[in-house]
């Protein structure tokens, strides 16, 4: 039996999956998919996912579930980031996904988001003995990760998580502009 794993990222902008098979003791990606869902859209205005957003996200997860079955995935990890941390009805979305697909979604902390970003980035940094800073600019938040020395253990970094991503910053600036305009009119 092959070891086949899936990683699913339910982000503020995209929902992504990577399915990997272990071939000759090395990971080989056998499937990748990404769908723009803009989960964070309108969160700045009402702080919840609309019914249509929940329906569309669940539809994407149905496709992911089907693909995981086709590829005989043995194990998976599904994480959700900023949008699900912020929305007041994220549990409704997560339960709907599970009910319709059997996929369990885990909302991760900003620390865990930064840690995962760091370790997925380290393979691309040639000399991380020097000081490095990594920016992870998402749809709902931005993580700044600081590393000073060669990272040997999972806690050897500092990070800052800002609630400003591509979508959230745009919407927050719209809120500010509308209130400023209304103030000027008065």
Predicted regions and their residues:
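A short glycine/small-residue-enriched secondary-structure motif
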Residues: 33-40, 70-75, 93-99, 112
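Short, well-ordered amphipathic alpha-helical segments that serve as non-catalytic structural scaffolds
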Residues: 55-67, 184-186
């Amino acid at each position: 039996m092959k070891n086949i794993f899936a990683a699913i990222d339910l982000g503020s902008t995209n929902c992504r999956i990577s399915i990997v098979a272990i071939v000759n003791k090395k990971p080989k990606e056998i499937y990748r998919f990404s769908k723009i869902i803009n989960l964070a859209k309108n969160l700045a205005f009402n702080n919840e996912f609309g019914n249509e957003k929940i329906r569309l996200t669940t539809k994407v997860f149905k496709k992911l579930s089907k693909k995981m079955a086709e590829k005989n995935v043995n194990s998976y990890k599904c994480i959700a980031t900023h949008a699900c941390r912020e929305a007041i009805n994220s549990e409704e979305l997560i339960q709907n996904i599970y009910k319709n697909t059997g996929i369990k979604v885990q909302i991760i902390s900003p620390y865990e988001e930064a840690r995962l970003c760091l370790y997925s980035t380290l393979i691309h940094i040639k000399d991380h003995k020097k000081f490095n800073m990594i920016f992870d600019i998402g749809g709902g938040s931005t993580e700044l990760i600081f590393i000073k020395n060669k990272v040997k253990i999972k806690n050897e970094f500092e990070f800052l998580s800002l609630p400003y991503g591509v979508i959230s910053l745009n919407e927050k600036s719209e809120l500010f502009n509308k209130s400023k305009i209304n103030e000027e009119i008065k």
